[in-house]
Amino acid sequence: MAIPEGHGAPLIALTSGTPEEARTAVAQNLKAGVNAIKIAATGGVTDAQEIGEAGSPQMSVEQMRAICDEAHQYGVIVGAHAQSPEGVRRSLLAGVDTIEHGSVLDDELIGMFRHNPNALRGYSALVPTLSAGLPLTLLGQDATGITDIQLENSKNVVGGMVSGARQAHEAGLMIGVGTDTGMTFVPQYATWRELELLVAYAGFSPAEALHAVTAVNASILASMPRPVLWKSANPLICLC
């Protein structure tokens, strides 16, 4: 979900301009059978038209609060695309359950993650998605195909994502593993790469990365309504 002409709109997002419209969009999603809602709280790198647009707040706290309130009534979690400290702060204040991507954190934000009375379970988690951001800054434009504006925005955003992941880990916050599948160089099977990046850039030990992708992810998703046909999956394969 996004504001009109916001990040992801209209190609991959229902749009809303008021809290009332936001509630209607949530209801539409729930009727379609979704078990989680993602909102674009800030601008993003891939569709930014100006330097600084990525990470700039887009959706109002009031709209995000309406979305969270409506979704939480049905036990549905809400994740927020947020790529700046202010975007993260506003999202947490509204009651989102996860922050996707993230930014540099301070003591206030760390405290809001740890104790978030507006979130479904009283706390919020960070999902850094390093594998979505790092290729944009580590590889050349001939490989990524991004514009000069997108490159400058990615430099600003990705550094914050990496710093935030490391800070959250040091603070003992709940950190899940996600990849933002569909981004450049992020295929469906790339979860293993995210584990490597958490170890290389965010200070995780290999065991901590495995714990995040299994136990922590399970905790984050624990309240999601299960479909009639539910199959559990674990990314670990043990060879004996």
What are these regions (language model features)?
Residues 1-17, 139-150, 154:
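Acidic/polar short surface loop at catalytic or gating sites that assists cofactor/ion binding
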Residues 73, 146-148, 158-240:
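His/Asp/Glu-enriched, well-ordered alpha-helical/loop segment
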Residues 5-25, 56, 73-82:
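Active-site mouth loops of central-metabolism enzymes
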Residues 19-35, 105-125, 165-167:
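Short amphipathic alpha-helices and their capping/turn segments at secondary-structure boundaries
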Residues 40-159, 176, 181-183, 202-204, ...:
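Active-site core of metal-dependent hydrolases
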Residues 21-24, 63, 208:
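An acidic, carboxylate-rich microenvironment
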